[in-house]
Amino acid sequence: TYNELEKIEKPGKAKHVAIGNGKIVTLYLDREAASEEEAIPATVEVFEQKDEDLTNPLHSFTVNTIEPNNGKNVVAVKDNQIYVCRGAAGLYVYDMEGNEQWHYQMPNPINQEGNYKALANGCYVGDKYVYIAYGSYGLVVLDKTTHKVVARRAVVKSANYVVEHKGYIYVAYGKNRLQVFQLKNADPETSYEK
């Protein structure tokens, strides 16, 4: 059994939580949604991990919007950078105080009907690369330093979550499958010991 230790109310959906660099980072919507497609501002809060106190953030900052608001919206923390999957807007990277460092959005993100083609759902950050599960656009691997695309793999289903381990890239797709890739024609990831 589990004992509830703490419950912290937020004005809108709690979207994701990540731990890294001695910090706990949370993402939540600033208000309740009227519809799932609505773009809603969100807040990122940064807490000291050692304190385990989620009521008193060291820093908090507003993220312009999360659209649609019913997406995965994974957050990752590495090298004192916060990576936020903002759905239609792509992946945004901030420092711990909330200053935007860079962002990636797929090319030509809007279709002829005026709708977004794909959503940045999940991300994983290694020592050398940033991996994005970019919905129907597929898996995108970016060089962490130059922010350039190193590889991209589109498949039929929507890429939702991604993790890299020992040179293998694991992607969870929305409709019943896990797919494993290995990066070729590029330097290997350095986030593991050989």
What spans do the regions from the language model cover?
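Blade-level signature of beta-propeller repeat domains, shared across WD40, Kelch, NHL, RCC1
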Residues: 157-194
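A short beta-strand motif characteristic of beta-propeller blades
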Residues: 3-9, 56-66, 100-114, 148-153, ...
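Short loop/turn segments that connect beta-strands within beta-propeller blades
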Residues: 1-3, 48-53, 95-99, 143-147, ...
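Beta-propeller blade signature
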Residues: 41-48
